[in-house]
């Protein structure tokens, strides 16, 4: 837009739509000579009068035309009518017609509907009714414009007058009026709403629509865009038509138009009325009155539009005439001509035009707004405007136009003033708005905006003269530029750039001016192209004068036409006007509807006719085909008859000779003849062979036995075939024999019964096979393949029919299972008994084997022709139950399919019943009921229930019964429903028993879907229908009835259930499904599911007191009989009372007991790593709680906790095992060895494999608290669980996952944890439990236990972590255990180390505890969770602690947690999960414990369970252990470095090692492997971490860095420091206690003393301090780990290593490398960084030596990042290491500063600084990113999100992530502190302790946000890590110092900014 002419404001505005047209018209016409002003005033007056009269006239004309008086719109209505769609006659055609003359765009905007179709392609520019509407929106302007147009365009006088009138009348209501215009009237309301709603839009849109046209587009863009801003006003003020400087825009395009438009607004209308409008009016008038009005409005708009367009399209004259009334056109022409000509022709002119435009812009914009529509209207006609002749003819000559324009310019000036004044608010606004759009033109426009009225008017006037001059100058150009104008109009862009292509743009501008001038103007322009600007002025003036004359004439005419129209014109719309409009709209709608209906009817009729025609054609086609077929058949018959006639008489040789001769002759004569001869010869030979074969076999038919004998058949056939191998004919005798045999068999079967039938069928098949019809196509039920294999096609058809018949019989008799085996197996395998045999007891064996030929497609799901894949068991065994097959098939097609699938009908009853049961399980249906009532519509006997079959073969039936009885054990009574599903036969039963599971799935190899398979396999649909129907019936039938309650349900019916059942039946009657639902909903808590059949059977049993014999009568017996056990005093309908009475207390007690037991279980199951048991899972709290205990391989056992029944369902489904609907406990009876093993491990007390109750589990795992003993990663959670148990109560709820509930105890979170574990494995962070569930968990936790002490805090975490389980973890630092457990357990595969992994999903919550997901399990408890509420951490401390831990722990463990989440959540938190918050021990163990879960958990346990003293003692012990571990881990880490995968576990230990400086060297070796083994890290690292962490923990503990030992620990240390500051007790913090004031120093000392172990702790601490420092004042972390903070700085590399270690535990095993390792890790992660890590390791060593905190910091960083991005972590760690090194060098002071800042309480600042550093320090950022982003960098934001609740953690994690960058500052400070052993850390630590809590929270947020922000930079920078050189680190350090400072500043100044990322 702006590209147009810089001079033309409008150009820019309008550039969009039309290109330069609008632009060219922009400035011209701005200047209005006094004369023009006077003229404009006169014109305005004239216009008003004219409008009134025109309105009257228009009304009269409208009525004369037969218009609906309601549709007619007065004044405003007229304008509206312009828009009004009601005036369909105003349609584009009308506009086009009337304005086409004028080359109006009106065509485009003819339809009221088109109001919205501004961009209509039809319109050259998009000029449309919308344009008109927009113009009308600026009705007052439009009125003026229309008046002008009418004046200009006498042709349009009608329209013009109408529109002008309407415009005038609706000056205030123009917007609505416009909508109400004839065209738009129907949609007036809609349009109004749109326009009113979006006046700017409509104006702009409309303008844009207009702009769609040449000038119009531009005007619209500019006016439109401007109009958008302005148009709203304009739209609001329909008067604003004038305001819309649409025309002026065009004037800008066409110079004059703008003034004209302005004038249009007021004077312009007058002028329009005077002269210019006439033309428009003429064009408009051509349209119907309303159309005319609309057109007039359009015309005005058009006129203006056309003016612009004309310039653009060279249709300016036309545009002027049509769109820019002569006046508008003239003025526009003059102004635009001058401006445009100058502007378009000359950039100067354009500039002036812009100025003019500025002046005009104001008015012009107003005008434009109003005229944008006009322009639009004229857009289409614009191109027509190209036809100057048309314009000339239509409009006044150019000269007139020019003169008019001259007048207009003046008038426009006045008009502009008036209009601007009138519409200044709107118009001016519009202008201003428009102007902004054309900022190039904005100067003038803005000026106009500023002085919309006065300035715009003045400018308009002034610029009018200038424009006129320019137009005069450019008028010449106009004509010359007419083409250019056209081009511009065609190419709005060029016009848009009218300023750009000066010459062409100017030309178009001039052209636009001419167009604006109107036809007359255009002529004048044409004539004037050679003339000078003076001529232009003269022409303008003349045109204006002419326009005035025209206006006067119009006035007279109007006066004649209508008197007293003025009042109408002036009057504002009343409600009746709106009513009329609405009526018109409705009428239009009705008309439209009628049209639509008519159209629809026509279409329907057409379709009907077409359909009939098609049918007729089809019939003809069929007839033709029939004819052809008959001809062909006749020909074939004739051929064969002729051949037969010839053959007998001729010898083969003779015929051959003849044929040969014939062939030769024919070859000579005709190739065809030869061919025919050859064919004939072949046919004769074939017949001969056939005859001979028949003769040969003549004996065969006499000996059916022989025929049946496959050998004989084969031999005979072979003999025959060998003679003539070419022919494979079926011996006729054979077929006959076969047919007879089949028929006899069928007859026999019918007589004897289904079994016989089966035999017969089988024998028939066998016979077929014997006969040598190996194919035995008939075997295919479908018959589709019946002829497939038949030797002779002819006979084949017969055999096919036979087979079909037989099949039908078989199907009837066998219910499509006659060949059940065959359904998968081919029925008629050549083998003989192939399929039906199986059904028939006769050939079960062969059925098993015979599967080669798919004989019958029983409705097996796969429809496979498997050769009895299950054949032996199913086929051979199943054959007997043909009936069953039939019955089952009938009963349930699915079962039938299944039966056939499994073995065919043999299994039918038993199998089918089984199938139904198994169908769900993919076992054959064991439809006891189905078998009981085989409704297969098999043959009569089989068709009858299979019982008939049984009658036939009672022994089999009995056997089946026995089998069914036995089967329940074997099968999980699929439905529990089927008593002994009487196995069809023993074989079937055996198969069922043997294949209960196998049959269902393996038999067919495909599991059929009952419906699909049946249908697919069904021989015929009828059968399938029968099957289905039968199935339903069969279901009702119970085969052998076994009390479903006994064997049918996995769980025996309890008394409560019996009572409930009886009561429900009593109340509800035998509505078994309803009762089942009620029972299930009531018994949800027990996880017991009773299906309707079960309920029915049980009720029968209860009522009948029989084993289930009365099952059939269950329905009958259910209601009437009373149940003895029914609670007394419960009347009918009291079931609800009963349930309430029985259920309420039971549920409460059950839930309580369940929860307590779950907690106990959690303790017990301290997740022995060996637990093969999937674990006890709190499946969900359905009512209160549903527990699903999965023991062993997933066999479900009911946990008979008072109310607790673990449903096999859930277990099985959870395990993926087939489910019995939880009915059969017996089915579970045999416990697999693996299950026993698992159970023995998990439930040592329950080795008998009996059903375990949660109590049993609890008893079994009482030792769970021995975290140390349970360190095994296998069940690390068990360890944690116990330690967490104290918090576990809370944890369960906190985690937000049910598993979380046991935060500590995995068992509680078993299900969740399992999921978590899975999630952890797959790095899938788990979503948090629903709030209500969390709430429930919280409540339960609180309610449930004393150990739920943490529950409140946990619940808070749960609430906090509500969004994410991790978050849940967050709230409960202790909850960490829960969340951690919950999440962590799942998080890491290694048992509850998995918890650490779990922490990963819990990461959020774990993060809350500080990235120490698992550590959070413990750590959060200690301090990890804000709501640690753990005994470990006081609730308040928990929060700060959590913050701290999150910050501190968050740094290393927190990040790992995130990392873990992001990463495989293997490392997730293991390294970081150091339970920094938990205890320093936990922290120490955290990385490893996290990794190991158990070791951590032990730490966690003790901290969790133990408060200060216990924890301290425990921490001390753990520290010792930790030290041992650290030593071990150092060793392990060294080799783990080599073995990354498992070393990860060790490396997590290395993490601990990194926590302890000792391990840092060890860690180093693992670094390279660890990075490589990062993915495995999570599982192994957890294990190793546990193992190592324990030593580390002990070491760290010994070091006195409760949190230092591990990055997690360090994180904990931060929290612990805070906590210690609060609680100095925490075991890990005992040293911290000592160090509380001097913690940092002590930590530094310890770290130094510990070497890397301390460094690691320090790193952790530093990480925490970073996190805390970043999130919390590092000082705080420094406080708690002032030394850590200090060491971190010096040891940033070490810290990186440590972090890495910590994180490595979770992710890379950088943690083992500790600081060095982390450095290596980052490098190794980035790529071949191991050497770099080695260097870094050296650096770390140096760092460790320097302060050991440096290694710690890198460790923390790594820890932070590693979980998030093992690879990313490595780079970031590397970077961090480098940075740390630099920092150590440069940043020691900086670090000190940072630490000091942290201490200053600027934890946020430090966080921010760190965050800033993060971005600046790619390495550190990488760490942050890695840490935060569980996945790579992205994890960070996630971490932040996850850490939202764990703000501390999040920030901790973020700071941990930041540490690299933050470490730049924080770590730098730390490293400096550490290196310099500055007590600053320590000293600052205490100082920042309070800040830490706040800062951590604050800073964490900031840090997290910051980190998120810096993540990108981190991501970018991670590449740096690849540069492991110390130089890089130094550079980073050097860079970081400023960054630290900046970051500090940022953190202090804009903590919230961190959210940016």
From Swiss-Prot:
One biological process term in Gene Ontology: regulation of timing of transition from vegetative to reproductive phase
Domain annotation SANT: ranges: 1049-1105
Pfam family for this entry, one: HSA
Bias kind Pro residues: ranges: 1563-1579
Keyword Ribosomal protein recorded: no
Additional free-text comment from the UniProt record: Decreased expression of EAF1A leads to decreased levels of H4K5 acetylation in the promoter region of major flowering regulator genes, decreased FLC expression and early flowering.
Name of protein: Chromatin modification-related protein EAF1 A
Biological source species: Arabidopsis thaliana
Gene: EAF1A
């Amino acid at each position: 837009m702006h590209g147009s002419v810089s001079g033309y404001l409008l150009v820019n505005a309008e550039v969009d739509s039309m290109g330069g047209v609008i632009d060219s018209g922009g400035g011209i016409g701005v200047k209005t000579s006094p004369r023009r002003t006077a003229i404009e005033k006169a014109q305005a007056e004239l216009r008003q009068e004219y409008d009134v009269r025109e309105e009257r006239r228009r009304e009269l004309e409208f009525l004369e035309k037969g218009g609906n008086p309601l549709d007619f719109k007065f004044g405003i209505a007229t304008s509206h009518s312009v828009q009004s769609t009601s005036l369909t006659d105003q349609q584009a055609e009308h506009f086009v017609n009337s304005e086409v003359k004028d080359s109006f765009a009106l065509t485009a905007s003819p339809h009221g509907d088109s109001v919205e179709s501004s961009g209509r392609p039809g319109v050259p520019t998009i000029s449309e009714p919308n344009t008109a509407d927009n113009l009308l929106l600026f009705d007052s302007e439009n009125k003026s414009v229309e008046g002008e147009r009418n004046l200009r365009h006498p042709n349009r006088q009608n329209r013009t007058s109408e529109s002008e009138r309407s415009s005038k009348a609706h000056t205030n209501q123009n917007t609505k009026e416009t909508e109400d215009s004839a065209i738009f009237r129907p949609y007036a309301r809609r349009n109004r709403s749109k326009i009113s709603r979006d006046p700017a839009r409509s104006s702009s849109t409309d303008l844009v629509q207009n702009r769609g046209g040449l000038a119009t587009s531009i005007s619209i863009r500019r006016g439109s865009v401007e109009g958008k801003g302005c148009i709203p006003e304009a739209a609001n003020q329909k008067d604003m038509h004038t305001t819309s400087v649409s025309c002026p825009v065009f004037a800008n395009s066409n110079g004059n138009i703008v003034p004209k438009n302005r004038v249009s607004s007021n004077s312009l209308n007058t002028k329009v009325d005077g002269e210019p409008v006439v033309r428009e009016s003429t064009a408009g008038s051509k349209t119907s009155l309303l159309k005319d009005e609309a057109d007039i409005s359009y015309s005005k708009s058009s006129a203006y539009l056309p003016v612009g367009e004309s310039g653009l399209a060279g249709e300016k004259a036309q545009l002027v005439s049509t769109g820019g009334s002569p006046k508008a056109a003239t003025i526009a022409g003059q102004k635009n001509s001058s401006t445009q000509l100058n502007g378009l022709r000359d950039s100067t002119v354009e500039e002036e035009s812009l100025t003019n435009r500025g002046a005009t812009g104001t008015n012009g914009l107003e005008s434009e707004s109003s005229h944008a529509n006009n322009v639009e209207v004229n857009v289409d006609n614009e191109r027509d405007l190209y036809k100057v002749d048309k314009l000339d003819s239509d409009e006044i000559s150019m000269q007139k136009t020019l003169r008019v324009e001259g007048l207009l310019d003046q008038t426009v000036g006045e008009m502009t003033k008036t209009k601007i004044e009138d519409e200044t608010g709107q118009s001016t606004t519009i202008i201003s708005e428009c102007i902004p759009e054309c900022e190039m033109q904005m100067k003038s426009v803005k000026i106009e905006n500023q002085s919309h009225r006065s300035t715009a008017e003045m400018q308009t006037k002034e610029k009018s003269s200038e424009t006129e001059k320019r137009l005069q100058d450019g008028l010449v150009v106009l004509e010359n530029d007419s083409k250019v104008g056209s081009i511009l109009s065609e190419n709005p862009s060029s016009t848009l750039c009218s300023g750009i292509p000066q010459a062409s743009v100017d030309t178009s501008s001039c052209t636009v001016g001419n167009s604006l001038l109107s036809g007359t103007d255009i002529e004048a322009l044409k004539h004037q192209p050679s003339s000078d600007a003076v001529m232009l002025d003269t022409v303008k003036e003349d045109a204006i004068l002419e326009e005035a004359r025209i206006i006067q004439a119009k006035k007279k005419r109007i006066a004649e036409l209508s008197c007293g129209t003025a009042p109408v014109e002036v009057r504002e719309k009343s409600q009746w006007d709106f009513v009329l409009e609405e009526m018109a709209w409705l009428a239009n709608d009705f008309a439209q509807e009628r049209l639509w209906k008519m159209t629809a009817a026509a279409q329907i009729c057409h379709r009907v006719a077409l359909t009939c025609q098609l049918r007729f054609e089809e019939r003809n086609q069929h007839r033709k085909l029939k004819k052809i077929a008959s001809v062909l058949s006749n020909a074939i018959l004739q051929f064969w008859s002729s051949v037969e006639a010839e053959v007998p008489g001729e010898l083969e040789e003779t015929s051959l000779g003849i044929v040969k001769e014939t062939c030769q002759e024919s070859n000579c004569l005709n190739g065809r003849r030869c061919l025919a001869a050859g064919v004939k010869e072949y046919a004769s030979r074939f017949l001969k062979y056939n005859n001979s074969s028949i003769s040969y076999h003549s004996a065969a038919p006499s000996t059916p036995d022989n025929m049946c004998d496959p050998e004989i058949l084969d031999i005979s056939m072979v003999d025959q075939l060998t003679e003539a191998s070419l022919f494979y004919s079926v011996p006729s005798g054979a077929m006959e024999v076969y047919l007879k045999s089949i028929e006899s068999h069928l007859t026999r079967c019918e007589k004897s019964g289904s079994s016989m039938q089966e035999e017969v069928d089988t024998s028939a098949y066998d016979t077929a096979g014997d006969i040598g019809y190996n194919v035995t196509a008939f075997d295919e039920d479908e018959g589709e393949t019946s002829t497939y294999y038949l030797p002779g096609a002819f006979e084949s058809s017969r055999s096919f029919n036979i087979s079909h018949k037989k099949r039908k019989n078989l199907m009837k008799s066998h219910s499509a299972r006659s060949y059940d085996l065959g359904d998968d197996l081919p029925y008629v395998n050549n083998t003989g008994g192939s399929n039906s045999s199986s059904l028939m007891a006769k050939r079960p064996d062969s059925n098993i084997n015979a599967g080669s030929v798919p004989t019958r497609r029983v409705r097996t799901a796969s429809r496979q022709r498997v050769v009895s894949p299950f054949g032996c068991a199913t086929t051979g065994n199943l054959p007997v139950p043909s009936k069953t097959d039939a019955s089952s098939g009938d009963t349930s097609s699915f079962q039938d399919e299944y039966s056939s699938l499994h073995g065919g009908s043999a299994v039918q009853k038993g199998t089918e019943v089984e199938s139904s049961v198994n169908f769900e399980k993919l076992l054959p249906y064991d439809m006891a009921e189905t078998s009981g009532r085989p409704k297969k519509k098999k043959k009569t006997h089989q068709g009858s229930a299979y019982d008939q079959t049984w009658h036939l073969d009672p022994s089999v039936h009995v056997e089946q019964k026995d089998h069914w009885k036995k089967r329940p054990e074997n099968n999980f009574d699929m439905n529990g429903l089927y008593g002994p599903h009487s196995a069809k036969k023993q074989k079937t039963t055996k198969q069922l028993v043997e294949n209960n599971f196998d049959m269902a799935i393996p038999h067919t190899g495909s599991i059929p879907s009952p419906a699909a398979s049946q249908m697919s396999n069904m021989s015929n649909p009828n059968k399938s229908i029968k099957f289905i129907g039968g199935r339903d019936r069969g279901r009702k039938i119970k085969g052998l009835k076994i009390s479903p309650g006994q064997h049918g349900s996995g769980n025996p019916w309890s008394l409560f259930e019996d009572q409930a059942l009886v009561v429900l039946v009593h109340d509800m009657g035998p509505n078994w499904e309803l009762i089942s639902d009620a029972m299930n909903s009531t018994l949800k808590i027990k996880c017991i599911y009773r299906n309707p059949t079960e309920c029915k059977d049980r009720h029968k049993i209860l009522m009948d007191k029989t084993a289930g014999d009365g099952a059939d009568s269950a329905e009958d017996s259910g209601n009437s009989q009373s149940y003895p056990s029914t609670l007394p005093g419960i009347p009918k309908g009291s079931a609800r009372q009963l349930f309430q009475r029985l259920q309420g207390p039971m549920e409460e007690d059950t839930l309580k007991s369940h929860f307590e037991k779950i907690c106990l279980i959690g303790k017990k199951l301290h997740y022995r790593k060996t637990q093969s048991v999937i674990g006890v899972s709190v499946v969900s709290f359905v009512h209160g709680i549903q527990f699903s205990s999965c023991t062993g391989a997933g066999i479900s056992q009911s946990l008979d906790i008072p109310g607790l029944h673990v449903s096999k369902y859930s277990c099985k489904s959870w395990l993926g095992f087939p489910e019995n609907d939880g009915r059969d406990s017996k089915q579970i009876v045999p416990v697999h060895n693996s299950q026993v093993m698992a159970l023995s491990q998990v439930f040592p007390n329950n080795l008998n494999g009996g059903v375990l109750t949660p109590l049993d589990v609890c008893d079994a795992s009482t030792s769970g608290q021995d975290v140390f003993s349970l360190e095994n990663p296998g069940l690390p959670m068990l360890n944690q669980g116990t330690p967490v148990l104290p918090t576990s109560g809370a944890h369960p709820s906190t985690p937000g996952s049910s598993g979380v509930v046991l935060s500590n105890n995995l068992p509680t979170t078993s299900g969740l944890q399992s999921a978590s574990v899975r999630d952890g494995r797959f790095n899938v962070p788990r979503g948090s439990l629903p709030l209500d569930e969390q709430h429930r968990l919280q409540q339960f936790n609180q309610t449930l236990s004393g150990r739920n002490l943490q529950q409140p805090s946990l619940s808070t975490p749960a609430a906090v972590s509500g969004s994410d389980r991790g978050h849940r973890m967050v709230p409960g630092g202790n909850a960490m255990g829960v969340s951690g457990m919950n999440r962590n357990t799942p998080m890491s595969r290694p048992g509850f180390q998995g918890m650490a992994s779990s922490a990963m999903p819990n990461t959020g919550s774990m993060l809350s505890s500080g990235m120490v997901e698992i550590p959070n399990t413990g750590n959060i408890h200690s301090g990890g969770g804000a709501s640690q509420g753990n005994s470990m951490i006081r609730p308040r401390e928990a929060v700060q602690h959590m913050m701290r831990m999150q910050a501190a722990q968050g740094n290393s463990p927190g990040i790992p947690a995130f990392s873990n989440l992001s990463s495989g959540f293997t490392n997730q938190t293991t390294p970081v999960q150091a339970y920094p918050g938990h205890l320093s021990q936990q922290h120490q163990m955290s990385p490893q414990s996290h990794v190991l879960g158990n070791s951590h958990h032990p730490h966690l346990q003790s901290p969790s369970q133990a408060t200060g003293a216990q924890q301290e003692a425990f921490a001390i012990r753990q520290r010792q252990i930790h030290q041992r571990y650290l030593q071990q881990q150092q060793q392990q880490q060294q080799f783990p470095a080599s073995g990354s995968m498992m070393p990860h576990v060790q490396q997590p230990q290395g993490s601990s090692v990194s926590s302890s400086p000792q391990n840092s060297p060890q860690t180093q070796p693992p670094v390279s492997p660890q990075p490589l083994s990062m993915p495995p890290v999570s599982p192994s690292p957890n294990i190793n971490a546990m193992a190592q962490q324990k030593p580390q923990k002990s070491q760290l503990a010994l070091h006195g860095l409760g949190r230092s030992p591990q990055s997690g620990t360090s994180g904990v240390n931060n929290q612990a420091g805070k906590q210690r500051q609060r609680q100095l007790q925490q075991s890990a913090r005992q040293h911290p206690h000592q160090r509380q004031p001097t913690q940092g120093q002590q930590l530094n000392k310890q770290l130094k003393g510990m070497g890397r172990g301390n460094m690691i702790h320090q790193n952790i601490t530093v990480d925490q301090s970073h996190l805390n420092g970043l999130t919390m004042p590092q000082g705080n972390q420094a406080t708690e780990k002032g030394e850590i903070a200090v060491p971190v700085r010096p040891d940033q590399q070490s810290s990186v290593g440590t972090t890495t270690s910590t994180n490595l535990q979770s992710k890379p095993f950088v943690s083992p490398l500790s600081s060095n390792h982390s450095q290596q890790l980052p490098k190794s992660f980035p790529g071949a960084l191991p050497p770099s890590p080695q260097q870094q390791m050296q650096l770390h060593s140096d760092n460790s030596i320097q302060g050991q905190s440096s290694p710690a910091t890198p460790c923390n960083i790594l820890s932070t990042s590693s979980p998030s991005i093992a690879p990313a972590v490595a780079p970031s760690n590397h970077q961090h290491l480098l940075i740390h090194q630099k920092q150590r060098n440069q940043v020691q002071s900086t670090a000190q500063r940072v630490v000091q800042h942290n201490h200053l309480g600027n934890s946020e600042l430090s966080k921010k600084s760190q965050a800033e550093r993060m971005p600046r320090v790619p390495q550190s950022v990488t760490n942050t990113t890695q840490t935060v982003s569980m996945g790579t960098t992205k994890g960070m934001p996630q971490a932040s999100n996850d850490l939202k609740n764990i703000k501390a953690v999040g920030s901790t994690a973020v700071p941990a992530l930041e540490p690299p960058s933050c470490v730049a500052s924080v770590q730098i400070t730390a490293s400096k502190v550490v290196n310099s052993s500055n007590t600053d850390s320590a000293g600052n630590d205490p100082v920042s302790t309070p800040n830490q809590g706040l800062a951590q929270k604050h800073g964490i947020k900031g840090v997290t946000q910051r980190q998120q922000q810096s993540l990108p930079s981190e991501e970018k920078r991670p590449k740096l890590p690849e540069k492991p050189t110390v130089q890089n680190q130094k550079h980073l350090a050097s860079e970081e110092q400023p960054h630290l400072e900046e970051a500090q500043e940022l953190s202090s100044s804009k903590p919230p900014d961190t959210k940016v990322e």
